[in-house]
Structure formats: structure tokens, C-alpha cells
Curated annotation (Swiss-Prot):
Main location group: cytoplasm
Compositionally biased intervals (Low complexity): 333-347
One GO BP annotation of this record: cell differentiation
PANTHER family on file: N-MYC DOWNSTREAM REGULATED
Subunit organization: Interacts with CTNNB1.
Domain of life: Eukaryota
Gene from which this protein is expressed: NDRG2
Taxonomic lineage from the root: Eukaryota, Metazoa, Chordata, Craniata, Vertebrata
Residue positions where Phosphoserine is found in the record: S312, S314, S318, S321, S324, S330, S336, S338, S339, S341, S356
Species the sequence originates in: Macaca fascicularis
Chain positions with Phosphothreonine modification: T20, T316, T320, T334, T343
Protein name, as recorded: Protein NDRG2
Gene Ontology CC, one term: growth cone
Task performed by this protein: Contributes to the regulation of the Wnt signaling pathway. Down-regulates CTNNB1-mediated transcriptional activation of target genes, such as CCND1, and may thereby act as tumor suppressor. May be involved in dendritic cell and neuron differentiation.
């Protein structure tokens, strides 16, 4: 394996409006379940996986991930990886509305489209970053193709199929709420929606006035008809790669993420609960999530000497990452952090980290 590159940065900052954005290459490929559009940034790096993202319902890759990947400190990461942002069918900008009666793919079928994307690009492995429905899709893909997934960052994942009580509540809500309002309730907490901040107003406007709202409803229906992933700690059905679960404190999917954490391999899984981040931490707290993503990559043997930014200014943090590179690329990690409010330390993955700075 090539020697790990050390990159030093001194401060975090949003991407300035005057900075030149990366060139994007947009591709579409036919799959057994229809066409899928994806956008590629950067060039492949030797012996490094691609970062592949999948967005949630009501969003596309830009509205879901742009605040995170355009964040100043994230540039240290993305200059070391090629990125592939997948848009669910009909969610890409300018997508035509599907004809009446169109059979939208299930979430399992959306996962089955990903091999076509990787084959088209000639990419062998990925690190997946998914939110909500996208987190489910990437998890299903990882279960079906474990050898091609090096790691997963799963934000707001709900691995369970809807039960009868969920269905009853969903149907009842549908009688009194519009599709945009139901999707907003999926994306954000009730506290956020009641506060009606600029962020909420922005995303309410995006979803309510989306020209492809009929397509969004089809994706929403597929999400609500998802199958149970049937994760089982110690069983055959589990994620084989390192996993970082992320959820905001008091977010709509907090309980589902906690339950998911209890079902995954504790030696491979870290759980990050972010305070003051609401339902979409990649939108509201890109700095904190970037820092956590750096830790995650370091634990996998990438970017082992990346310096600290926001967290280092608010607390004392130490990171020890030891990687044993063999045929199975086994890796281990230790993270300890202390602050004025107390000490949080963890050994191997399988812990819950609460970030409140």
C-alpha cells in the first residue's frame, strides 16, 4: 500500500463564494431497472476507494450533500478521493416527470443499480455516505456486495420495515398532511419545523415547489415500502465493513439509529449522536461531521495524520490510529476526548460519541 499522505491545515472555514468550484462530470447509465444519473468529482486515486453518496427522499445530491462537501475543512478529504454522487431516478436536476402508472424501483432495486455505476466507471471499491433512504440503499448494496464496500457512513438510517402501527400512523397523517409536509417531517424534527428557521423555509420551498414532485412521491412510496434489512448481531446478515452511524439529538430517526447500532457488529461500528444538529446534521453541522469523517477515515488507514480543527479548539483530543495492512486490510482505532464537562473515551468501534461543541 502506498505511504499515507500527511496534510496539515490550520483553520476551518466555509468554501468562499469566490473560490472556483470543482468540475463536475455528469453521467447516465442504463440498468435493469431504468436509467440512473450520477455526478463525478475529481480523478481516481491509486489504491484508494471512491466516496459514493446517496441522498434522502425529497432531496437530490446537491441539496443533500453540497453544504458538507463544499465545507472548507472537507477539502482536505476530497482532494484525496474521487467522489460519485448518485441521484435516485427522477431526482436529478431537470428530470422529466415519469408518466402516469410508471413503476418506480424499490429500494432494493435502487441498490441493484449501483453495480452498473461502478462497472461504468471501472471502480472496484467505495466508501459509502448515505442519508435516510440513501443510507438504507447503501446498506442493502453492502449486504449484497460486501467485497466492494470498504466503509459506510450512515446518517438517519432506519433498517426496519414499517410495522402495522407505523402504517396506520402514516395513513392517518396522509389524510391531513400533504406529501411535502410528510417528507419534511421525515427530514426534520418537529422542533425544527415549529421554529421555521431559514433552513426550514428553504427546504420547504425546495420540496413544495419541486417540478418533479410526482417523482419525489414515487421515491417516498418506495421508502415507505422498504423491506427489513434483518441485521443480526453475531448472525450472518450484518455489515462486514467499518460503519459510522450518525444521527442528531432529538432527530426523527434517533430511536431507529440506536436500534440499528444494537444490531451491528460492535467491533466494526461507531455511533455518533450530534447535539444541536437537528434532523440533517450534514446540513446544520458540516464542520462537526467533517471532523468525525476524518476520524473514520483515519481508523481505516487513510489520512492518518490529519490535524484537528473545530474540536481541537474546544477540547483536548487525541487520536491514535494503528493499521495492520494484510490481505484482509484489518484496522484498529482508539479515540479519546476530554472536555470541561467530563471525559469521553472509547476503545474499538461500537461506542456512542455525543458531540456538543
Amino acid at each position: 500500500m502506498a505511504e499515507l499522505q500527511e496534510v496539515q491545515i490550520t483553520e476551518e472555514k466555509p468554501l468562499l463564494p469566490g473560490q472556483t468550484p470543482e468540475a463536475a462530470k455528469i453521467h447516465s447509465v442504463e440498468t435493469p431497472y431504468g436509467s440512473v444519473t450520477f455526478t463525478v468529482y475529481g480523478t481516481p486515486k491509486p489504491k484508494r476507494p471512491a466516496i459514493l453518496t446517496y441522498h434522502d427522499v425529497g432531496l437530490n445530491y446537491k441539496s443533500c450533500f453540497q453544504p458538507l462537501f463544499q465545507f472548507g475543512d472537507m477539502q482536505e478529504i476530497i482532494q484525496n478521493f474521487v467522489r460519485v454522487h448518485v441521484d435516485a431516478p427522477g431526482m436529478e436536476e431537470g428530470a422529466p416527470v415519469f408518466p402516469l402508472g410508471y413503476q418506480y424501483p424499490s429500494l432494493d432495486q435502487l441498490a441493484d443499480m449501483i453495480p452498473c455505476v461502478l462497472q461504468y466507471l471501472n471502480f472496484s471499491t467505495v466508501i459509502g455516505v448515505g442519508v435516510g433512504a440513501g443510507a438504507y440503499i447503501l446498506s442493502r448494496y453492502a449486504l449484497n456486495h460486501p467485497d466492494t464496500v470498504e466503509g459506510l457512513v450512515l446518517i438517519n438510517i432506519d433498517p426496519n420495515a414499517k410495522g402495522w402501527m407505523d402504517w396506520a400512523a402514516h395513513k392517518l397523517t396522509g389524510l391531513t398532511s400533504s406529501i411535502p409536509e410528510m417528507i419534511l417531517g421525515h427530514l426534520f424534527s418537529q422542533e425544527e419545523l415549529s421554529g421555521n428557521s431559514e433552513l426550514i423555509q428553504k427546504y420547504r420551498n425546495i420540496i413544495t415547489h419541486a417540478p418533479n414532485l410526482d417523482n419525489i412521491e414515487l421515491y417516498w412510496n418506495s421508502y415507505n415500502n422498504r423491506r427489513d434489512l434483518n441485521f443480526e448481531r453475531g448472525g450472518d446478515i450484518t455489515l462486514k465493513c467499518p460503519v459510522m452511524l450518525v444521527v442528531g439529538d432529538q432527530a426523527p430517526h434517533e430511536d431507529a439509529v440506536v436500534e440499528c447500532n444494537s444490531k451491528l457488529d460492535p467491533t466494526q461500528t461507531s455511533s455518533l449522536k450530534m447535539a444541536d444538529s437537528g434532523g440533517q446534521p450534514q446540513l446544520t453541522q458540516p464542520g462537526k461531521l467533517t471532523e468525525a469523517f476524518k476520524y473514520f477515515l483515519q481508523g481505516m488507514g487513510y489520512m492518518a495524520s490529519s490535524c484537528m480543527t473545530r474540536l481541537s479548539r474546544s477540547r483536548t483530543a487525541s487520536l491514535t490510529s494503528a493499521a495492520s495492512i494484510d490481505g484482509n486490510r484489518s484496522r484498529s482505532r482508539t479515540l479519546s476526548q476530554s472536555s470541561e464537562s467530563g471525559t469521553l473515551s472509547s476503545g474499538p468501534p461500537g461506542h456512542t460519541m455525543e458531540v456538543s461543541c
